[in-house]
């Protein structure tokens, strides 16, 4: 991430024009049914913002199948740090997040937070919702855009559940198959409480196969 973006030594006319544009960022949680393309959409959105020279943090919440090892080569990452190190702390701080952000060498405006290859939910001590909330709140202070790639298992994934509650906007994805319908029928009742704020959810159909689109 280009933390030096506003430095006098880094400023040029193009950046000044960019900075004149209002920032309308926030925290976006991408959530939905299994195989609905949550990670792909999250990465594409983060990549688009980074190409527009917008600082963005992509938080990859999956601890069962960490996405980072299959998203980019190790050589594309400036330093390997783990999401687990952040959540294992008794209190999350801004400095702790910065130390554990993985910087993407191909674009200074994109950094990622996620589990590393070989790590899983038992690699680090269990965390509570307080650490997850602190991570999201402080990440939003570091970068104007924060995208959380949530898992589908919100009943046991604390970070994804907190992201759905704390995010400014939730992008809810669903596929055109019976599995997605079954998933939403099962999980949406869990979000009926007002704390989930269903009104902030943007609904989209994604990962549509050719035969599904024509049917």
Model-derived features: positions:
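Hydrophobic/aromatic beta-strand patches that form the interior of the parallel beta-sheet core
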Residues: 28, 57-59, 111-113, 169-171, ...
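Conserved catalytic-core segment of NTP-binding enzymes
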Residues: 134, 140-141, 145, 150-215
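N-terminal regions of ATP-driven nucleic-acid and macromolecular assemblies
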Residues: 16-21, 25-27, 79-101, 178, ...
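Cytosolic-facing regulatory segments adjacent to core modules
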Residues: 96-106, 112-154
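Phosphate-binding loop that captures ATP/GTP phosphates
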Residues: 52, 56-111
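Walker A/P-loop phosphate-binding motif and the immediately C-terminal alpha-helix
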Residues: 20-68, 139
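Extreme N-terminal, non-catalytic leader segments
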Residues: 1-33
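Anionic group-transfer/hydrolysis microenvironments
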Residues: 31, 62, 116, 151, ...
């Amino acid at each position: 991430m280009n933390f030096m973006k506003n430095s006098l030594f880094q400023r040029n006319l193009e950046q000044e024009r960019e900075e004149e544009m209002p920032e309308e960022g926030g925290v976006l949680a991408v959530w939905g049914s299994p195989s609905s393309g949550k990670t792909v959409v999250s990465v594409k959105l983060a990549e688009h913002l980074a190409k527009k020279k917008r600082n963005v943090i992509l938080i990859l919440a999956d601890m069962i199948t960490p996405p980072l090892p299959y998203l980019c080569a190790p050589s594309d990452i400036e330093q390997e740090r783990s999401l687990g190190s952040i959540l294992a702390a008794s209190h999350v701080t801004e400095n702790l997040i910065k130390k554990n952000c993985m910087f993407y060498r191909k674009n200074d405006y994109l950094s990622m937070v996620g589990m590393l290859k070989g790590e899983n939910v038992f690699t680090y001590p269990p965390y509570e919702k307080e650490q997850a909330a602190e991570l999201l709140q402080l990440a939003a202070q570091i970068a104007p855009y924060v995208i959380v790639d949530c898992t589908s298992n919100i009943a046991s994934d604390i970070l994804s559940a907190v992201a759905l509650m704390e995010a400014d906007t939730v992008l809810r994805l669903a596929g055109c198959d019976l599995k997605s319908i079954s998933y939403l029928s099962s999980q949406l009742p869990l979000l009926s409480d007002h704390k989930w704020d269903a009104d902030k959810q943007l609904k989209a159909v994604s990962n549509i196969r050719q035969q599904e689109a024509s049917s």
